[in-house]
Swiss-Prot record:
Mn(2+) binds at H22, H28, H64, E108, E110. Binds 1 Mg(2+) ion per subunit. The magnesium ion binds only when substrate is bound. Binds 1 Mn(2+) ion per subunit. This is Isopentenyl-diphosphate Delta-isomerase. Residues 26-160 form the Nudix hydrolase domain. GO terms for molecular function: isopentenyl-diphosphate delta-isomerase activity; metal ion binding. The gene is idi. One of its GO terms (cellular component) is cytoplasm. It catalyses: isopentenyl diphosphate = dimethylallyl diphosphate. Belongs to the IPP isomerase type 1 family. It comes from the Bacteria. Pathway: Isoprenoid biosynthesis; dimethylallyl diphosphate biosynthesis; dimethylallyl diphosphate from isopentenyl diphosphate: step 1/1; Porphyrin-containing compound metabolism; chlorophyll biosynthesis. The keyword NADP does not apply. The active site is at C62, E110.
Length: 177
């Protein structure tokens, strides 16, 4: 099945096949979700079979909305599909645009709606092995430090979010000094 995502072509938002959007480096819509339990954030290591950035750590989940799908609905859908997480309320936190080389001749040029969801620390997580290699909870401050010390272990977008948009995503109380 071909997955069509919203992308800008010659200034118009239109459906484009997902891989083509990355091959051409087209500006396209995306979502990212951070599930938090207090100061801890749930992160995932991307499955080895992913077509870009396999084996790298990322935020809780991220994807592209389908053509015609609302970003908030997409966030809830991908929490369920990637991690088996249901019942959380996702709250819009920020919109970020970035462009990054993700290897293999692919470019992520995304306009990302970022959502945050609060969860209990005993949240059941059931990752889809086609999407997720492993998950872990990590204190947000420790994660920011890890990303600075070992950027090669993390996806470009997570590095960008934590380096450039921390306060806008997580609020003043969670900003690492």
């Amino acid at each position: 099945m071909t997955e069509m995502v919203p992308a800008w072509v010659e200034g118009r938002l239109m459906p484009v096949e997902k891989l083509e959007a990355h091959q051409r480096g087209l500006r396209h819509m995306a979502i990212s979700v951070f599930v938090m339990a207090g100061e801890a954030v749930l992160i995932q290591r991307r499955a080895a079979g992913k077509y870009h950035t396999p084996g790298l750590w990322a935020n809780t989940c991220c994807t592209h909305p389908r053509w015609g799908e609302e970003a908030a609905d997409c966030a809830v859908r991908r929490l369920r599909e990637e991690l088996g997480i249901t019942g959380l309320v996702t709250v819009f936190a920020d919109r970020v645009e970035y462009r990054a080389d993700v290897g293999n001749g692919l470019i992520e040029h995304e306009v990302v709606d970022i959502f945050v969801a609060e969860a209990p620390s005993d949240l059941p997580v059931n990752p889809d092995p086609e999407e997720v290699w492993e998950t872990r909870w990590v204190d947000l401050t420790d994660l920011a430090r890890e990303v600075k010390e070992h950027p090669e272990r993390f996806t470009p977008w997570l590095r960008i979010y934590l380096a450039e948009h921390m306060e806008r995503i997580f609020g003043k109380l969670r900003v690492v000094q």
